[in-house]
Amino acid sequence: MSLSLWQQCLARLQDELPATEFSMWIRPLQAELSDNTLALYAPNRFVLDWVRDKYLNNINGLLNTFCGADAPQLRFEVGTKPVTQTLKTPVHNVVAPTQTTTAQPQRVAPAARSGWDNVPAPAEPTYRSNVNVKHTFDNFVEGKSNQLARAAARQVADNPGGAYNPLFLYGGTGLGKTHLLHAVGNGIMARKPNAKVVYMHSERFVQDMVKALQNNAIEEFKRYYRSVDALLIDDIQFFANKERSQEEFFHTFNALLEGNQQIILTSDRYPKEINGVEDRLKSRFGWGLTVAIEPPELETRVAILMKKADENDIRLPGEVAFFIAKRLRSNVRELEGALNRVIANANFTGRAITIDFVREALRDLLALQEKLVTIDNIQKTVAEYYKIKIADLLSKRRSRSVARPRQMAMALAKELTNHSLPEIGDAFGGRDHTTVLHACRKIEQLREESHDIKEDFSNLIRTLSS
């Protein structure tokens, strides 16, 4: 039995799984083959349980394919394989991009560290954590739209500076990126109370750099940011067109990565789509793991409302939560704001929270939402996105270049409007409701299988909800 068996499995899994899933769950595994047993070592219990639950059948199937009746037994363990073994020689196209193409700045010895905003500075800087203790993994509502992002963030909290460095989270406004940043910070400090974890908005980094330049304290600024254990920066897209800030962050990024210090970044778009940011930075943003957070699906929106109501000791009937979630779809922040308004109105008036009461309390918000998202608007937006004509969406043409956008538009109409399936079908050239149902199921399936379709859906949701 060849020691290349696990390499063969890696190559096949890389072809079969979405890139994000492969990077997050399969790449960190180490393997040891002995006595007809293939031992897979996971970095922690969380990864072990996830792999065993989600990918056990995939791996066993590949072992049977490659070995037949001689397939080894699988064994999962937490930790690393014995150092005497040399099995983990990954397939070349599985290896993460090399990070040695650019000269990196020299690290400052610990004895020389100092705080940048006090001159003369103390020997050891005072770190402004800025991590919000209220945002934890426990009160982050998980759903299909954010499951991978939460899992990746949890991994980083348990193993900072490890495989997912940097971690880049992207998605629209109000979807939970900032919550996860704080949750990671809290997780790291819970495991290591003395960890130097710094959270900030990207604009604060720029402001601190400007202040350091004004005070002739740029070296202290560098030492401060390059000596943290974890740097969590929100909305990195605000570095756009700030050349000096990008230059300084470029060297800070290199220094932190060289020291195995964790970097987590968030943005409202995929790294390569950030305009005004240097290519060398955008390339580095993708060195670790990049994960999208999508707008929450209906079930997650309902769960968010129920959890928020419970935190406020408010009894929210399920049908009321469903009514709100069905009509407000863009992001978590909008949902929570709507619920806060409902709760405030109920407290002021002493009335029970019913669907009629919610319809009255949120009448302007609901009217605006219905006005913004119409089937006509969806058709126009989808046609422009795919560079086809609206008439094509309504036609009987079945070529993939037309059929797929038509299915996407139908799925968006079901997701973003309150129209019934027959009404949606009628708006798309008089199609039957079963055609609409098939389109919705097809797009849901493709979102699981195709990164491009998933990105298209997210981009269109963002455009239509903005």
From Swiss-Prot:
Residues 1-86 are annotated as: Domain I, interacts with DnaA modulators. This is Chromosomal replication initiator protein DnaA. GO terms for biological process: DNA replication initiation; regulation of DNA replication. Oligomerizes as a right-handed, spiral filament on DNA at oriC. Its main location: cytoplasm. GO terms for cellular component: cytoplasm; plasma membrane. InterPro entries: AAA+_ATPase (IPR003593), Chromosome_initiator_DnaA (IPR001957), Chromosome_initiator_DnaA-like (IPR020591), Chromosome_initiator_DnaA_CS (IPR018312), DnaA_C (IPR013159), DnaA_dom (IPR013317), DnaA_N_dom (IPR024633), DnaA_N_sf (IPR038454). Domain I is involved in oligomerization and binding regulators, domain II is flexibile and of varying length in different bacteria, domain III forms the AAA+ region, while domain IV binds dsDNA. Residues 130-346 are annotated as: Domain III, AAA+ region. Residues 347-466 are annotated as: Domain IV, binds dsDNA. Keywords: ATP-binding, Cytoplasm, DNA replication, DNA-binding, Lipid-binding, Nucleotide-binding. It comes from the Bacteria. It is found in: Cytoplasm. It comes from Salmonella enteritidis PT4 (strain P125109). Plays an essential role in the initiation and regulation of chromosomal replication. ATP-DnaA binds to the origin of replication (oriC) to initiate formation of the DNA replication initiation complex once per cell cycle. Binds the DnaA box (a 9 base pair repeat at the origin) and separates the double-stranded (ds)DNA. Forms a right-handed helical filament on oriC DNA; dsDNA binds to the exterior of the filament while single-stranded (ss)DNA is stabiized in the filament's interior. GO terms for molecular function: ATP binding; ATP hydrolysis activity; DNA replication origin binding; lipid binding.
